[in-house]
């Protein structure tokens, strides 16, 4: 195995950190930070590095991850069959590569490839859910979560008219049905009008609105929002329902589920590009967002044989659409300051319809992007909803009109006036004011009370800004001392006795908090919800974590240990070390900890019975292909390598096993034949 050079390892760590942050924002907070194109490009780069240097790959890494950790405000439920993600293609060549990989795995010749049949389904931009039925009764509904465990949102799903409460007697004794909850474009516009009318923040897009509506602690809020569901797959089933995916969709229809009427059976792979082109033309006329098409092998027995690779099935692929575009005028470029001090340029636009959504703001990413695209205030610009979620400016439209001067990016914070520095190798300029910068203080407080952090009901962005301006809350610990301002609160508009008492009760409920939520709530750069959970599981207690972080100075043994934690890495370790090097941050943390009653440790995740084993396959296997055997081993928690070493736990000997069998004997490593492997794997 080739060991990765330092430059590759550093780039891999940076990509891991970025992808973890973006995953947490998209799946955990329903607030995507980057476009699909940016995300997919970063993930492809990560996969290429891991392909070249396998030692960089870890089972906790972004290449193996699906979704985000479930929110503990809801009950957690372990899926009977994991809810995984999909790999993407963007053109006919990418799809041909998918078909070729399927053929190689199954050992098909050209005739076998031509005989493959597919089911095409529009890829709905919503929230994936799993519905469990037992003895014909709907008993549980969960979100995807991290793919292994999801959030129990049964009470909210019971408000959806598209979900049958009972299945007919022919249904299996126990079955999981997968679907996508979404909000139509017309319902989204109506909902946002209602949000604005009552002074609430409008939703960014239909997906965010659907996800936010389903993940309400009050089911009556969900009931008031017209959510819909398309059923599209099975998870676990106690007895077979069909032999093909198409027949399964027909069965779902007969049970009372809504299946997307645009789903189609496709007899030959060569017909797929025409279907893609047709649906791409029609997508803007649909009353719901789609960002691509999912193609699945129709034969369920072939799906079972193909299984999964990492986080995605081998038998399905998502063909993603290019983003929809429009032209409008750039009115203003505003520089916003985030909780980590990042200066982010936001474009204010003349409102324009892009793919059925009215857009008036767009991201410009950073100063390099502004300079590279040469966009200026007053320009006509080409805009796209990248990944159908985040509006982004592609560049100016050539025009004979006179242009304004090039935009000058500030080198000082527009809020506090501190120097805004740009670290070598980074694209973002950051305010150096830290927690002396009002913008960063307020944004960190908003982050701390957010749903995936302390989740304090009644204390949202608007309240935090109001209480900050009034001087009631200036640092995290002040939240738990808010009762000191009770009389003043009761005199403020909109704060009566009932609302104040409810707020105090919600605050008191959060004096007991999981360690992972505390770590995440601090708003440290690069520390997403998943990283926070990894740290909490590793250090177990607040005292252990705090002591280790204080000791993690540059070049220290503790700093090296921190960077070596699976899924953390050097980039995240550097941010933690920097945070704890500031005395003000330590004082703020300790002040907060004094207000808390109990900081709860995280439970370690359950593992497969081959977890921790390093397995090598050698020779020819007769009952399955080598990739199939590898997939089974990895699913059971093992790591599969190509070479035998002292770290190898087991060598599986197929027919005509050669030098690897000999080396295993020399090193005294356990070996089994193929039948022994099948017994070990529970086949």
UniProtKB/Swiss-Prot annotation:
Its cofactor is Mg(2+); Mn(2+). SUPFAM superfamilies: BRCT domain, DNA ligase/mRNA capping enzyme, catalytic domain, Nucleic acid-binding proteins, RuvA domain 2-like. Residues 605-683 form the BRCT domain. The keyword ATP-binding does not apply. GO terms for cellular component: cytosol. Zn(2+) binds at residues 413, 416, 431, 437. The active site is at residue 123. It holds the Pfam family DNA_ligase_ZBD. Keywords: DNA damage, DNA repair, DNA replication, Ligase, Magnesium, Manganese, Metal-binding, NAD, Zinc. GO terms for molecular function: DNA ligase (NAD+) activity; metal ion binding. PANTHER family: CHROMOSOME TRANSMISSION FIDELITY FACTOR 18 (PTHR23389), DNA LIGASE (PTHR23389:SF9). Belongs to the NAD-dependent DNA ligase family. LigA subfamily. DNA ligase that catalyzes the formation of phosphodiester linkages between 5'-phosphoryl and 3'-hydroxyl groups in double-stranded DNA using NAD as a coenzyme and as the energy source for the reaction. It is essential for DNA replication and repair of damaged DNA. This is DNA ligase. It comes from Gluconobacter oxydans (strain 621H).
